[in-house]
Regions:
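Short strand-turn motif at the edge of the Rossmann-like AdoMet-binding core
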Residues: 167, 190-194, 218
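Residue-level signal for inorganic ion chemistry
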Residues: 33, 94, 191, 233
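Short alpha-helix immediately C-terminal to the canonical SAM-binding loop
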Residues: 112-114, 195, 199
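Helix-to-beta-strand junctions that scaffold the AdoMet/dcAdoMet cofactor pocket
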Residues: 181-183
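Class I SAM-dependent transferase core
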Residues: 2-75, 81, 111-131
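Short "lid" loop at the C-terminus of a central beta-strand within the Rossmann-like core
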Residues: 139, 192-196, 221
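Conserved SAM/SAH cofactor-binding pocket of Class I
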Residues: 60-168, 174-177
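SAM/dcSAM-binding transferase cores
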Residues: 200-256
Length: 256
């Protein structure tokens, strides 16, 4: 597929080869996204090659890098939640390439999730493994059971992997995400640029929430000068029951 030539080249540079079915699904996803983007603001990136690099490839990189470069567990049928998924990144590309994962796409805006429900149906992403959308705020959905209404399922400490490309600072993002992670599970934060200062400012908060930074991996997207970073955090202890705090507080007053 000529339209995917650069994407395929970038994939080969990272030592993995997408199948024709995966490429077809990515193309269908792109077409659905750009069409829906005309009525609901999903992304400012709509050029096909840019979407391939900045959304598709970037979503996949942590999970396809050789383990001697980035020691992240390989995916099989683990339970994963994508917090603040937006237009479905990184969750949808990960589900396309790792179809057996049991994926929850969480966002606070129902309009985005309506789009993602359409994507799931159109791409038949529920053929293998589970996939669902979840509407709400992270501060409420990951609260301890005693703070939940009886009709709300318990999501706290129930996921093997939590991923997020949300733009919040790492301290705030950790308060959103770490409560969802099982003990010994992982939180993976995708970040733009260099993050040394941001990481240092978040170390105490991450520890307070029960996490430990395993690795910070800076990289440049293939055939570009675009700098990104991956922050890998492992859950070592249960998150104290007072976290996350009430909705809005993690962003207004980040833990330090």
């Amino acid at each position: 597929m000529d339209s995917f030539s650069q994407f395929i080249e970038d994939c080969k540079f990272l030592h993995f080869d997408p199948t024709m079915e995966q490429l077809d699904q990515l193309l269908d996803f792109f077409e659905l996204m750009t069409d829906y983007n005309k009525k609901v603001n999903l992304t400012t990136i709509t050029d096909f090659e840019e979407v391939c690099k900045l959304h598709f490839l970037d979503s996949l990189i942590p999970f396809v890098l050789p383990e001697d470069i980035f020691p992240f567990p390989r995916l099989s049928c683990e339970k994963m939640i994508d917090v603040g998924t937006g237009a479905g990144f990184p969750g949808i590309p990960l589900k396309i390439f790792f179809p057996d994962i049991r994926l929850t796409l969480m966002d606070s805006l129902q309009k985005r999730l309506t789009f993602l429900d359409e994507v799931i149906l159109s791409l038949s992403l529920n053929r293998k493994g589970e996939i669902q959308t979840l509407h709400g705020r992270a501060e409420e959905l990951s609260a301890p059971a005693k703070k939940l209404r009886q009709d709300v399922p318990i999501y706290r400490e129930s996921f093997d992997f939590v991923v997020s490309r949300a733009v919040a600072n790492l301290s705030t993002l950790s308060e959103y995400c770490i409560p969802f992670v099982k003990i010994n599970g992982f939180f993976l934060s995708y970040k733009a640029g260099h993050v040394e200062d941001e990481v240092q400012q978040a170390v105490k908060a991450i520890s307070l929430l029960g996490g430990e930074i395993i690795q910070v991996y800076p990289y440049t997207l293939p055939n570009s000068e675009i700098q990104r970073s991956i922050i890998l955090i492992q859950k070592k202890r249960s998150t104290p029951s007072e976290y996350p705090r009430k909705p809005g507080l993690p962003s207004k007053k980040p833990l330090s």
